[in-house]
Structure formats: C-alpha cells, structure tokens
C-alpha cells in the first residue's frame, strides 16, 4: 500500500527535530452544496531542523517515531 503524501504549511518549529504542519482540505458539503475548508495539524519529523515557520512542505506517512509523530517531512515545496 503506498504511503500517503500531504502538502501543508509549517506553523511551529519550537521542538527539536519536529515541526507542526497545518494541512488544509477542501470538499463540497453534500447538503449545503458549499465548499468547506477543514484543517488538521500533524507533527512531522525534521531530522536537520531545516524547516521554519511559513515554509510550504510535503509530509509522508511513516512508522511511528514517537507517541504523536508518524509523519516525515520529505521535501520543501518552492512556490
């Protein structure tokens, strides 16, 4: 089974080797027929502490690294 890859924005880099990435998804509400935005925060592993707040990144699913962390930052999305 392929590992999921999500795109988001780094919103916190205070922890050592960890960043918090906000991932936003949009979908059409079935009853209201309106586009709804929903966001979720993921803790991701950043081995070299190279990503800062505001960076666009891609995260990939991985084995559990800690209690809350099972994603790895794979690349920086340069706009």
Curated annotation (Swiss-Prot):
GO terms for biological process: translation. Keywords: Ribonucleoprotein, Ribosomal protein, RNA-binding, rRNA-binding. CDD domains: Ribosomal_uS17. GO terms for molecular function: rRNA binding; structural constituent of ribosome. GO terms for cellular component: cytosolic small ribosomal subunit. Belongs to the universal ribosomal protein uS17 family. Part of the 30S ribosomal subunit. One of the primary rRNA binding proteins, it binds specifically to the 5'-end of 16S ribosomal RNA. NCBIfam families: PRK05610.1 (NF004123), uS17_bact (TIGR03635). This is Small ribosomal subunit protein uS17. It comes from Bartonella tribocorum (strain CIP 105476 / IBS 506).
